[in-house]
Design a protein with these regions (language model features):
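Bacterial N-terminal signal peptides that target proteins for export
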Residues: 1-9
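Phosphate-group recognition and catalysis centered on beta-loop-alpha active-site segments
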Residues: 23-315
Length: 315
């Protein structure tokens, strides 16, 4: 090989490497790539947003759940997904609120179904998970339209739709041009048709929530039924026993569908532990989940889970 030929080959190789590097997704595209790749590693879902303190990123105090402040914090710390709750107010406005009343999370009282957006805008959100003793903040009840606008291009949203308003919610998502930035989920039992192939769920990323009837359901059969002529992105696992997991993992691998679990509170898989256990020993809880086939984890401790994921990726 002549020097000129060698130089040409080297230049071509460098150009190819540069092209490959420049093609690597970044920002929300990287999150989308991670979510839709069953081998894409752990996906971090922040439950009701990043409302807990995140001292490693300069957030020493709590933020209200389901608030714009909780969303901004999720973006700042690098969470992949913010889970947030959607309900309909009396005037039809879609708003981000977990409970059917405003009592726990605001300085007001009453049923959301009896309050208009004008009523809601007068209320202040309470810090963190709320309650009568939680401090009031300057944050207000957020509309779905506001949540979509602020998250666009930055983070995925996992919408927990609390009322029978799926069509209205997905229509709002479509108007915002965010069909590939939003996850919607709905419960599925053994007799439920494959929801991911049905309107409006086929317009967004969709997760069936598997129903564990009486705690003894054949969850693998439920999951398999949801893959017939349909391709959900993930199955969300219910509260279940550890013995029910291996068959679900087999189904998920056979159909290239991820498994999502909550590590909230005591955790949703008996014997695996929850967030408090994971913050003490992340490998024992989150690591075990990941090794056993679960790759999407919803948590109230997103900063700690992100730290643990980073440690895995550095190994």
């Amino acid at each position: 090989m002549t020097l000129r030929t060698a130089a040409t080959v080297a230049a071509m190789l460098c150009a190819a490497l540069a092209t490959h590097a420049s093609a690597a997704p970044t920002g929300v595209a990287a999150i989308q790539a991670r979510l839709t790749n069953p081998d894409g590693g752990i996906v971090v879902v922040a439950h009701r947003g990043c409302h807990a303190p995140a001292p490693e990123h300069g957030f020493k105090d709590s933020a209200p759940e389901n608030s714009l402040a909780a969303l901004e914090r999720c973006i700042a710390i690098g969470a992949d997904v913010m889970e947030t709750d959607v309900r309909r107010a009396a005037d039809g406005t879609l708003v981000m609120l977990h409970d059917a009343t405003v009592d726990r999370t605001t300085d007001g009282t009453g049923k959301l179904s009896e309050l208009t957006l004008t009523d809601l805008q007068k209320l202040r959100l309470r810090s963190d998970e709320g309650g009568a003793q939680a401090p009031l903040t300057d944050q207000r009840v957020v509309t779905l339209e506001q949540m979509l606008a602020r998250s666009k291009g930055h983070i995925l949203l996992n919408l927990d739709v609390k009322d029978a308003i799926y069509v209205q919610v997905v229509d709002a998502v479509a108007r915002a041009g965010m069909q590939h930035q939003v996850i919607v989920k709905a419960e599925a039992g053994i007799a439920t048709p494959p929801l991911a192939a049905m309107l409006p769920f086929d317009k967004v990323y969709f997760f069936p929530i598997l129903i564990n009837a009486h705690g003894t359901a054949d969850l693998a059969a439920v999951a398999t039924a949801q893959t017939r002529n349909a391709h959900p992105v993930a199955f969300e696992l219910p509260k279940m026993t550890a013995a029910q997991l291996p068959a679900l993992v087999a189904v998920s691998k056979a159909h290239n569908v991820r498994l999502m679990v909550n590590s909230l509170w005591e955790g949703f898989i008996a014997g695996y532990g929850g967030d408090a256990d994971a913050e003490r020993d992340p490998d024992k809880v989150w690591g075990r989940m990941h090794r056993d086939g679960i790759s999407i984890i919803q948590t109230d401790a997103p900063e700690a889970l992100l730290r643990y994921r980073a440690s895995l990726e550095q190994r």
